[in-house]
Design a protein with these regions (language model features):
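Flexible "arm" and connector segments at domain edges
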Residues: 1-60, 64-103
Length: 103
């Protein structure tokens, strides 16, 4: 478990924030929406160049916290998951010249 997951787990234990994985997934989706809203606002809905604000950074932090809480509820190590994803993308790029799936 990495530093971020450990900090999230400590906070959850301290304040009784444990919840089932589906609740954590829903929270993550909600936080992603809030980040998306900040990106839209920061670019005037795509009309202007994106300006990163303190609110953008706060929402990114909320997304990261929610992802760590979801991973903890699933007993998954985010760093291991990330390493597997990087390996998958490197292999795919080596085979196809792209990282996107062909499904």
């Amino acid at each position: 478990m990495d530093k971020i997951q450990r900090a999230a787990a400590d906070l959850a234990q301290k304040y009784g924030l444990n919840a089932p994985a589906m609740a954590r997934y829903t929270d993550l989706a909600s936080e992603m929406g809030e980040l998306g809203k900040e990106l839209l606002l920061g670019s005037n809905y795509g009309a202007d160049e994106l300006k990163i604000t303190d609110d953008t950074a706060k929402e990114m932090g909320d997304v990261l916290f929610s992802l760590a809480m979801l991973a903890n509820s699933l007993d998954l190590d985010l760093e291991e998951c990330f390493d597997k994803a990087i390996g998958k993308y490197q292999k795919r790029f080596g085979q196809t010249g792209q990282i996107g799936s062909q499904t």
